[in-house]
């Protein structure tokens, strides 16, 4: 018997002046202590980005929860997403955290900043395998879960925070990792951790975000 249970929380802020968020998080529980979490970032911002990210996260989470392969998910997304008339591409990133029986996590990443994992209150440099599926470079990791592991997935609006204001080149992933590592010992909930991260991004943007920013913590 496995006594681990997952705590999931996420928070987004919109690009300044936009009513809709171009990032989307979808969570699907499959009833056997397995959960699919997808964070997607649609190209650009506003309505089009929102549609792209919502479709992407819904398609992936639903198909994976039904037991279909990652290859089938990626092919379905490529065939389904509306193509941008200006740039000629249908583009949306994704980070997938697939918890299986609350024992292992499959982490699948396409074009988002690499997820941060904190284990034993320290940043853990976890193994990754590079794959190509449907012409997309995808990173996959299979991780045996331990108690108090923390996964932090984010859209690129997080490391872009502070560009040209607080930092010349944004709030880099390593800086975000250090920030999250400093919070780990306090035992905050996933929702609180994701909120603290995104609130810090909002502050670095001067409360006028230049991009949608989303953090999802598991």
Describe the role of every protein-language-model region.
Residues 1-20:
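Regulatory cytosolic signal-relay segments
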Residues 3-6, 31-34, 101-104, 146-148:
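Beta-strand-turn-beta hairpins that frame and shape the catalytic cleft
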Residues 18-31, 125-163:
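Acidic loop->beta-strand submotif enriched in PP2C/PPM serine/threonine phosphatases
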Residues 24-80, 144, 152, 164-177:
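Primarily the active-site beta-strand->alpha-helix module of PP2C/PPM metal-dependent phosphatases
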Residues 41-42, 112, 150-157, 212:
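DG-centered beta-turn motif at the end of beta-strands
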Residues 51-121, 138-139, 186-218:
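Catalytic core of PPM/PP2C metal-dependent serine/threonine phosphatase domains
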Residues 117-127, 168:
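A short alpha->loop->secondary-structure connector
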Residues 160-200, 204:
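Juxtadomain coupling helices with adjacent low-complexity linkers
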């Amino acid at each position: 018997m496995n006594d681990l249970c997952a705590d999931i929380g996420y928070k987004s802020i919109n690009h300044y002046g936009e009513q809709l968020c171009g990032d989307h998080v979808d969570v699907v529980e499959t009833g056997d202590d397995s959960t699919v979490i997808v964070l997607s970032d649609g190209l650009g911002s506003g309505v089009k980005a929102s549609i792209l990210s919502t479709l992407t996260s819904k398609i992936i989470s639903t198909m994976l929860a039904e037991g279909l392969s990652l290859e089938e998910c990626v092919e379905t997304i490529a065939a389904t997403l509306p193509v941008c008339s200006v740039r000629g591409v249908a583009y949306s990133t994704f980070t997938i955290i697939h918890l299986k029986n609350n024992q292992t996590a499959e982490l699948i990443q396409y074009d988002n900043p690499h997820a941060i994992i904190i284990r034993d209150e320290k940043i853990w440099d976890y193994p990754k395998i590079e794959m190509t599926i449907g012409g997309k470079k995808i990173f996959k990791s299979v991780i045996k879960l331990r108690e108090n592991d923390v996964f932090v997935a984010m859209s690129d609006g997080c490391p872009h925070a502070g560009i040209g204001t607080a930092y010349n080149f944004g709030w880099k992933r390593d800086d975000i990792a250090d920030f999250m590592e400093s919070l780990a010992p306090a035992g905050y909930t996933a929702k609180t951790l994701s909120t603290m991260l995104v609130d810090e991004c909002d502050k670095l943007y001067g409360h006028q975000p230049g991009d949608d920013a989303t953090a999802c913590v598991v």
